[in-house]
Amino acid sequence: GLSLQNTNFKENGVSTNAKNSSIDYIAMQFRLNKRMGMAMGFLPYSTVGYDLTQVKSINKDEYGEDIESFHNYKGEGGLQQVFAGLGFKVFNNLSIGANLSYLYGDISYATMTSFNNTNAFSSVRSQKIIINSYKLDLGAQYTQKLGQKHVVNLGATYSYGHNMHSEGYNYTETYDSNSTLQTHSGDTINNAFSLPHTFGVGMTYVYDNSLTVGMDYTLQKWADCKYFNKEGQYSDRHKISLGAEYLPNYNGRKFWEVVRYRVGVHYATPYAKVNGQEGAREYGASIGFGLPIFAFRGRSMLNISGQYVK
């Protein structure tokens, strides 16, 4: 899967734009026997990429000129996921499955503070996280047909939370007005991060292979997780999502009859804390289309979507 992303950020009247493209995933699935299937693939687990600068007026010098501070916040990197999964149909209506993944990658954060006053020192605080660990996901799905045109699907998932094999690096440096290093301090912490226990439940209703309406709830137990061996840095995250997809004609022969139209909304509480306080709650809405390519009845799709998040 390939993706092209164009994102607009806005805060306190200041706007910026970011564009990126990536290979989202490479995955395959195949049947092992009548009741069992297997899947494997590679996909991004998380991505960090931002570079923001904030300017503040903090005082005046002896000449009446403003003394300004410049704060640059930068983050980059991400985690990749290689997975293999098995699914088994226990009964005609009930299926269970499990995915085992290997997570690897690194993420870097840096905060740089400087001043327009030539006598002031500047500072750089940076953190780097290197992770090589595993992830285990379990799931179950129950499908019930109600007559000829109605289908209800119920699902539940669980992701195992644990301490990850990881290394964390903390650095703090100060520089004088000539950019000469004055002080340097740092430390290394092993196995300082953890994944949250994650629980999810969901339901979809399908009418005549044409209209699908679904809802999903996820709880991530971030409050129990460590960040650089410190607890209490996070809060549990709750997310509720609602969505719908409409396919005009499942057996259609014309292009616009087999385009999939999608809408969705979601609400989520923050897991990160800012100065010990919970961050902003998240509200989002999306709209999208699934365009068939190569063949109207084929499985290949070009997905186009737009999302607004506040």
Model-identified regions with their sequence ranges:
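Subset of outer-membrane beta-barrel
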Residues: G1-K310
